Swiss-Prot record:
Boundaries of every Peptidase S1 domain copy: 34-257
Keywords assigned by UniProt, alphabetized: Disulfide bond, Fibrinogenolytic toxin, Fibrinolytic toxin, Glycoprotein, Hemostasis impairing toxin, Hydrolase, Hypotensive agent, Protease, Secreted, Serine protease, Signal, Toxin, Vasoactive, Vasodilator, Zymogen
Disulfide bonds: C40-C172, C59-C75, C106-C152, C107-C264, C151-C218, C183-C197, C208-C233
The protein's name: Serine protease harobin
Organism in which the protein naturally occurs: Hydrophis hardwickii
Compartments in which it is found: Secreted
A GO biological process held by the record: vasodilation
Tissue expression from the record: Expressed by the venom gland.
Amino acid sequence: MPLIRVLASLLILQLSYGKSLDNGAKAITSLDRIIGGFECNPSEHRSLVYLYNSAGFFCSGTLLNHEWVLTAAHCNREDIQIRLGVHNVHVHYEDEQIRVPKEKLCCLSTNNCTQFSQDIMLIRLNSPVNYSEHIAPLSLPSNPPSMGSVCCVMGWGTITSPEVTYPEVPHCVDINILHIPVCQAAYPTMSGKNILCAGILEGGKDSCKGDSGGPLICNGQIQGIVSWGRFPCAQFLEPGIYTKVFDYKDWIEGIIAGNSNVICP
């Protein structure tokens, strides 16, 4: 049955990671990954944030403005800390900043963050972030992405699969926006609502363990949030599933504007 794609260092003892499904298919998991990519240029990921707690790194997110970060709902944890302006996780830039959540809001309710359904979460920071050489926001989408668009997904997730190798620096990989039926063929029970299907049909490039919550960027705008997919990653005809940010744009802008009554799609 489906398993949540979790960071192996956190839950490998509790979960049968990568276990086969009843029908012989590979396990559907979450907390995604970068396979087949390259080290990101520090100037190209100024909005990328690093989420961690006492157990270590677990997700990425995206800075939207001085006070708000966007990530996946299944990245919700206790005692989240947020590093901004990070490239090499062992090296601290002078302009690096650390914040904690003042408020966490999920689409269903402030206290009910789900794993896959409406996999989106806003984090309000405890104090505003100062923009700098290594820290800048990313724009929300003005329009949904076109089919076939080449977009970049990034994060500190494993760069090998099924073996797990976590890099010190974020990796980026270019993938394509695909038609929803492509993902429905790979995952017959999934809903096609409020998601993007993205990847490379022949395999070899994908997000993977540790990339969840990070951005899928198309033409300089965040169009997707890494949500879930198959493990091992980057397999033939098995793209990844991303939360479709454009469908949540009104909700995001309403929450940021202070409208607690805004309706989630």
